[in-house]
Amino acid sequence: IESNNLNHGDDCRLVMSGNEFCGNATMSYIHYLKERLLIQHQQFQLRVSGCSHPVECKVHSQHYEVTMPKVHQVKERFVKLGDQQFKAFEISYDTYIHYVLMCDGVDLAMKQRVEDFVSAQTWHQQFKTIGVMLFQQDKQFIYPLIHIPKIGSLIWENSCGSGAASIGVLVNYLTNHDIQDYLVNQPGGSIIVSSRKSGQNEYQTTIKGQVSTVATGQAYIEQETMTQI
């Protein structure tokens, strides 16, 4: 669920239902604002939940681009899924954390083990979102599982912008080379990622994607369920 508040077009902000940050929702929000002629420039900033500073955004002819939150740390570790140990890369941010697991194939049993792992952990309260990306590197393909503790959700998503960004960071980390327009494929489509190393364990990362409006309508939400940015 995304909500937005507009104050004569000067105070644009996006608030997610779990107060988390979402790259895909930010791209969708840019599209929403552009359709309603509420943005006048190709490059601008938006305030988004889960991010303490304004988010840099760009409008291209075919894509919307979002500068992603900065990485705090990339760490190699092992996670136990069922009876097996898997090598994983832990990528942490201000308000969310991702685990990337390299795999050759993904089946229902593997997905269930990942769900069990996420559900069994006690996550630090700073993390609004926990994500696990099952990454088939040869196909540049991910299966993203997203958990939002505040609302108790645990969903295999068709597309995850922040997960795609973490893949860009990981490829940069593993190759020690900046990447430009790296295609991250997902069940629901593809996202373009660029990642540049800007310091010790620091990465400047952007995602680009295409957005179209498929339906419009009115949403009625109980006031007490709404979150504040």
Annotate each PLM feature.
Residues 70-72, 82:
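Ligand-binding beta-strand-loop-alpha-helix segment within the catalytic cores
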Residues 1-62, 73-74, 92, 97-229:
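A glycine-rich beta-to-alpha transition motif near the start of alpha/beta enzyme domains, typified by
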Residues 79-83, 88-90:
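N-terminal, positively charged, Ser/Thr/Ala/Gly-biased leader segments
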